[in-house]
Amino acid sequence: MRILLSELCYQRPRDTSLSGPRSTLVWVAVLAVGSIAPLTARACATCGCTVNSDAAMGYAAASGWHLNLEYNYINQDQLRGGTGTASAAGVVNRPSDPTLGGGEIEQATLNRYFDLGLSYRPNANWNINLLVPYIARTHSTYGQQQQPYVPSETTPDQLSYARVAGLGDTRLIASYQGLLPTHYLGLQLGVKLPTGQSGTAVSFHAGSDAGSPLDASLQAGTGSTDLILGAYYYQPVSQDFDAFASAQFQAAVSHRLDQPGDDFRPGNATTLSLGVRDETSAAWVPQLQLNLLHKSADQGDLADRPDTAGFVAYLSPGLTVRALSSLYLYGVVQLPVYSDLSGYQLFPRWTATVGLSYAL
């Protein structure tokens, strides 16, 4: 699962009778886990940027169309298990699935996401957001190694490589925030559609695993139709500071890969984000978020269930800049502060998101 910065649509009501930054700034609240990417069954299933992501892009309550372009960078190059780092020897000699007599030693997964978001707000209460991702991913692994571990199993000639490039799974999310006169409280209902290639669409192109299918959760799509439920709340806490909170739950309600021996269902994911923004200036808005994610294990014969669940926490500083009257630029860096991962998973040391938002 991956949550985009433009997914959670917080609308700050704009009172044109007021003066100062708060009456003129179209704001961007980057909230969620940045990018919780659909990562590998044998890499990190609970990694993100952003992005949000996991994340929220919000505009003042004016109606109209808005375009959002976003780039997310996630380099998973650290092997972790439980709450600490892991080693190749640990993966093989203390495998997450003892029945295998060893484990897969992954090297790295580099993810680059290019996301297009188009939203329409017919009035102050409703917003509809379409999100289309393009995924560029490379993955390298030393493959499955049997006990006991020996250093020759992690020499460069043992590496296999795979590359994924194409459209990912599209999301359509509706937001309603007419519950309060202030429009500070909102609810979300959405769906993720299986538009990306899934299952065994892409195989390793080099190394000893060449020709073998890439892990199902490393493909561009999951093959599942997911239900998305969310809620968010925004509150000014002083003349210059705002606080916000959001929660989102995503679960697969159907999956194409449902045949014996060829089935895959991504695990459910729950995100929670808390943050503050400093709106002293109308030209630039610094912000800080705490992003939490819990993900259950993937299911099915194509899933690596022991290595796909966990809980992670990120601290995410960000900045939004008003470049033109209708154009805003934003950036977020996500720093992991805690992780408790099942099995062994590849994990990023940091992630980054940059984007622009334009009122059409």
Residue positions per predicted region:
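Transmembrane beta-barrel strands of outer-membrane/channel proteins
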Residues: 67-73, 130-134, 187-193, 245-249, ...
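Outer-membrane beta-barrel biogenesis signature
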Residues: 39-93, 182, 194-199
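Residues on the lipid-exposed face of transmembrane beta-strands in outer-membrane beta-barrel proteins
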Residues: 55-57, 69-71, 116-120, 130, ...
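Extracellular loop and loop/strand-boundary signature of outer-membrane beta-barrel proteins
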Residues: 54-55, 100-104, 154-161, 214-219, ...
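Residues that define the transmembrane beta-barrel architecture of outer-membrane proteins
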Residues: 63, 110-114, 156, 164-170, ...
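Repeated loop/turn-to-beta-strand initiation elements of outer-membrane beta-barrel proteins
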Residues: 65, 126-128, 182-185, 240-243, ...
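Outer-membrane pore/translocation modules
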Residues: 134-263
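Outer membrane beta-barrel transmembrane domains
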Residues: 80-82, 86-96, 250-360
